[in-house]
């Protein structure tokens, strides 16, 4: 799942058991995710530009104050819990051929791929990550976890430099493939899912929708896991605007006009004649 869901999950669990929670997030985290986590009773610390830097800060705070550090994805118990999604999929669709799962640090993909293969080894499980944060793809090529120099993607919930070291062997064994998605593809997928299915899914959760165009799903039973709907209004407006531009539904027109009355009226008539607005 996207990191926004991880933050909220840990804050909720801490409140449920009456324990204080400190959640460390990158400074680039959308305000919606920050506020939702605070609403669940957690103290939020903003540090670093990417998840990996925030994680190191959380480890420092845990060591300094004697807190219990809970890793958002590099933990087998966390991955096992997320793997229950595979159990739900197989229960509802026993004949599923392929499962597409978003990849950030690898917790969700570890759980889903491992549980799916245990239930039916013939199921293909494909991880999908942003092209600008393809740490798992590069790590699988290298045969060990590698750290990207930088990440650059609008899918902030999966913007991770290094996949989990503990869970990496499970990913090597159980993932059949990894597909990477460009930001432009995510923008188009966002518009598709919003207009055609009336669903608001954040960019990280849309990775598996965009991945469908990289496959040939005809005649196959393919499940795309949509994880996360944590998108603030400013990001939403920007993605919609860019999506409409890519779909050629919004144009920017620049013209040089004589400084005489009636010129704007002529431009408006030209636009109206082609059913523009």
Residue spans for each PLM region:
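Short, small-residue-biased leader/transition segments that mark boundaries at the very start
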Residues: 2-7
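Alpha-helix C-terminal capping segments
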Residues: 8-20, 111-120, 210-218
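Residues at the starts of beta-strands that form the adenosine-phosphate
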Residues: 20-21, 43, 122-124, 221
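Small/polar-residue-rich loop-to-helix segments that shape phosphate-bearing ligand pockets
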Residues: 22-98, 129-180, 185-186
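Glycine-rich ThDP/TPP pyrophosphate-binding loop and its adjacent helix/strand module
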Residues: 89-122
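Active-site-adjacent helical/loop segments in soluble small-molecule enzymes
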Residues: 164-220
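Catalytic phosphate/nucleotide-handling subdomain of diverse soluble enzymes
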Residues: 213-242
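A conserved regulatory-domain signal marking ACT and ACT-like small-molecule sensing domains
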Residues: 236-277
């Amino acid at each position: 799942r996207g990191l926004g869901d991880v933050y909220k999950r840990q804050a909720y669990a801490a409140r449920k058991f009456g324990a204080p929670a400190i959640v460390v997030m990158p400074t680039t985290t959308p305000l919606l995710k920050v506020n939702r986590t605070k609403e669940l009773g957690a103290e939020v610390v903003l540090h670093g530009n990417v998840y990996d830097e925030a994680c190191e800060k959380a480890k420092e705070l845990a060591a300094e104050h004697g807190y219990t550090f809970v890793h958002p994805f590099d933990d087998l118990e966390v991955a096992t819990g997320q793997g229950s999604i595979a159990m739900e999929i197989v229960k509802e669709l026993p004949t599923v051929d392929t499962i597409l799962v978003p990849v950030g640090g690898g917790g969700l993909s570890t759980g889903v791929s491992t549980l799916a293969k245990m239930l039916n080894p013939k199921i293909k499980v494909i991880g999908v990550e942003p092209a600008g944060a393809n740490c798992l793809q590069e790590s699988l090529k290298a045969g060990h976890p590698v750290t990207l120099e930088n990440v650059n993607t609008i899918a902030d919930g999966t913007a991770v430099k290094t996949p989990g070291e503990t869970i990496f062997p499970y990913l090597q064994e159980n993932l059949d493939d990894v597909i990477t998605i460009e930001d432009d593809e995510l923008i188009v997928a966002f518009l598709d899912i919003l207009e055609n299915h009336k669903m608001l899914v954040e960019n990280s959760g849309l990775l598996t929708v965009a991945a469908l165009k990289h496959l040939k799903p005809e005649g196959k039973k393919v499940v795309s896991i949509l994880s996360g709907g944590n998108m603030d209004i400013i990001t939403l407006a920007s993605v919609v605007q860019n999506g409409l531009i890519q779909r050629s539904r919004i144009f920017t027109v620049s013209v040089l006009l004589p400084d005489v009355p009636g010129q704007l009226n002529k431009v408006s008539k030209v636009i109206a004649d082609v059913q523009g607005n």
